[in-house]
């Protein structure tokens, strides 16, 4: 990886692509690296520059100019922090969360009776993600306010997985109330120092001001083809704008407004599907060899 060379490393080779990551992120994904890299290096993720910096343990020197420093603990080879605080019922409630740099959501909260917060009044059912054991289902809602360190964030889109299915699929015995993912972390430059037990968060001011939004179309897309630029509807949520537009699983998207689908990547398509409540999206669709137009009216569902 770059100039990095490592011998005698343990690797896991999966014969079948269970996660189908390439299809859902729209770029070729050949593997995942985890604990061994993070444990042997100080890892800095610069989301705005799309850069990953590995610094040898002992060579990284923390300075306040690099951001705010927060303790982390490593359990079951995973990093956890107590730097997250929720606001509910007029009180601040610190929680322990997993720092999940491989997750696309902002915040995931365990949905079980023993937790100190309730499911929001307004939620939608959704497929929250995928693991080696299958699809993770649950609810999506909004948390009014939370803090990550000293930074306050409002109206965060949060995932609430079905407790039984989520616990079985995660398979971790570590006590935690949820996890934070890249939709939240991308608003910072993040440095993970497993060796000395801390993380550093340097805010990206423009990204901190961005609102938390969720897909307003109600459809999930997968990419296919050698260049991963052929886009198909993978799932349509009931009573969603996509369902109202007559879209079905297996439909191929040829044009999205004035854009040929082949000119867009997955992230750009989802950004178009977050353009605003009431916005119309014109689609050219192919189904079973037939081509037709349809209009999709975006709706903020949470």
What positions do the PLM features span?
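Pepsin/retropepsin-fold aspartyl endopeptidases
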Residues: 1-302
């Amino acid at each position: 990886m770059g100039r990095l060379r490592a011998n005698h490393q343990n690797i896991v080779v999966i014969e079948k692509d269970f996660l189908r990551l390439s299809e859902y992120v729209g770029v070729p994904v050949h593997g995942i690296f985890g604990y061994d890299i993070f444990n042997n290096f100080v890892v800095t993720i610069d989301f705005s520059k799309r850069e990953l910096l590995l610094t040898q343990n002992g060579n990284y020197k923390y300075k306040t100019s690099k951001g705010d420093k927060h303790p982390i603990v490593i359990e079951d080879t995973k990093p956890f922090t107590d730097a997250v605080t929720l606001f509910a019922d007029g009180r601040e409630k610190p929680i322990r969360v997993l720092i999940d740099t491989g997750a696309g959501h902002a915040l995931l909260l365990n949905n079980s009776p023993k937790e100190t917060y309730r499911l929001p009044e307004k939620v939608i059912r959704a497929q929250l993600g995928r693991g080696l054991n299958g699809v993770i289902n649950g609810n999506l809602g909004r948390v009014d306010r939370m803090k990550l360190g000293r930074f306050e964030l409002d109206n965060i889109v949060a995932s609430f997985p079905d407790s039984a299915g989520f616990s079985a699929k995660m398979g971790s015995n570590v006590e935690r109330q949820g996890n934070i993912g890249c939709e939240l972390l991308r608003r910072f430059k993040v440095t993970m120092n497993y060796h000395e037990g801390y993380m550093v968060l340097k805010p990206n001011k423009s990204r901190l001001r961005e609102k938390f939004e969720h897909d307003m179309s109600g459809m999930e897309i997968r990419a296919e083809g050698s260049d991963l630029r052929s886009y198909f509807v993978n799932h349509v949520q009931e009573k969603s704008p996509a369902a109202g537009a007559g879209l079905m699983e297996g439909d191929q998207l040829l044009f999205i407004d004035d854009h040929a689908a082949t000119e867009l990547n997955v992230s750009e398509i989802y950004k178009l599907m977050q353009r605003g409540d009431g916005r119309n999206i014109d689609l050219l669709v192919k189904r079973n060899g037939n081509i037709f137009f349809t209009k999709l009216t975006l709706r903020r569902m949470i």
